[in-house]
Amino acid sequence: MLTDRQLLILQVIIDDFIRSGQPVGSRTLSKKHEIALSSATIRNEMADLEELGYIEKTHVSSGRVPSEKGYRYYVDHLLSPQRLTQEDIQKIKSIFAERIYELEKVVQKSAQILSDLTNYTSIALGPAVKENKLKRIQIIPLNQQTAVAIIVTDTGHVENHVITVPASVNPSDLEKMVNILNERLIGVPLVDLKDKIYKEVADVLRTHIHNYDSMLKTIVDTLDIPQEEKMFFAGTTNMLNQPEFSDIQKVRSLMKMIEQEKDFYRLLRKHNRKGIQVTIGRENQLSGMENCSLITATYSIGNEQLGTIAILGPTRMEYSRVITILNRVASDLSTALTKWYQNN
């Protein structure tokens, strides 16, 4: 259990290090107006904090820096929310200023604004397409042999595919087929489409359409949309501006980790609990993340959780500001998407 004096000194050390990036010594602390203690007393308390594992020495300075344990205590017990400026609020509102047509575009824009506001790297995990339901199928003929198949989901996700139209299928049959598919499949989850087509819809098509089977496989293949969530990155080079990453080896390790999207995807998928989550350094259990912290929040439509937005920064990140911004964006994103979904 830390004493009140130790808590104060730990908080001031971490606040100062986050702001300056420089190790903090007893002399620096003795000049802080909130610490009315002698240098000798401060040194003794710092020695105790070091022994307890909350701060540690660096090789290049007599000052101390926070350890992972120190940051964890700081995030869990010492943080207070930071007020957003009017400029911050206006930037966040700009995400939703235009009419929403496609959910993924809004999520991507959110990632960009998060990166701009924090000067760190932001990541957004879009909704799982497998959770989407079919809203509409359109087939637009280009000529006698080809057409464009347009698949629209309930979240605004759009897929376009150029397909080959068999010579045995005439335009009126093609139009009839699309009408039957829309009538029978609207509202069906994408993951269930293939099964429903072959078990239920094929019999209806057989009754009404000549040579329906030559076109059916093409339609089924078109509806086979990749079902993993899309991941959007913004500000990946922002990390290079942080002093922690002046070491070329650390930069290489970090960039390699970002490029291996599958590992990062799995990491974000772990952070799918509601609310803000913070993982620091080695807590991320991913090579290249030893000097990084990841802060995540989920967004939803109504009570249905859709995806995750996150900020990746150095362990010396501005936790209070980032958490406040991320919380606001996640909340506003959920509100905007819920309204959009109800109106569509």
UniProtKB/Swiss-Prot annotation:
Keyword Transcription appears in the UniProt entry: yes
InterPro entries tied to this protein: GAF-like_dom_sf, HrcA, HrcA_C, WH-like_DNA-bd_sf, WH_DNA-bd_sf, WHTH_transcript_rep_HrcA_IDD
Gene source species: Geobacillus sp. (strain WCH70)
Molecular function via GO: DNA binding
Pfam family, one: HrcA
Keywords, comma-separated and alphabetical: Repressor, Stress response, Transcription, Transcription regulation
UniProt xrefs under HAMAP family: HrcA
Highest rank taxon of the organism: Bacteria
Role noted for this protein: Negative regulator of class I heat shock genes (grpE-dnaK-dnaJ and groELS operons). Prevents heat-shock induction of these operons.
Gene expressing this chain: hrcA
PANTHER family tied to this protein: HEAT-INDUCIBLE TRANSCRIPTION REPRESSOR HRCA
GO BP annotations listed: negative regulation of DNA-templated transcription
Protein name per the record: Heat-inducible transcription repressor HrcA
Entry-linked SUPFAM superfamilies: GAF domain-like (SSF55781), Winged helix' DNA-binding domain (SSF46785)
NCBIfam families noted in UniProt: hrcA (TIGR00331)
Annotated family: Belongs to the HrcA family.
Keyword Transcription regulation: yes
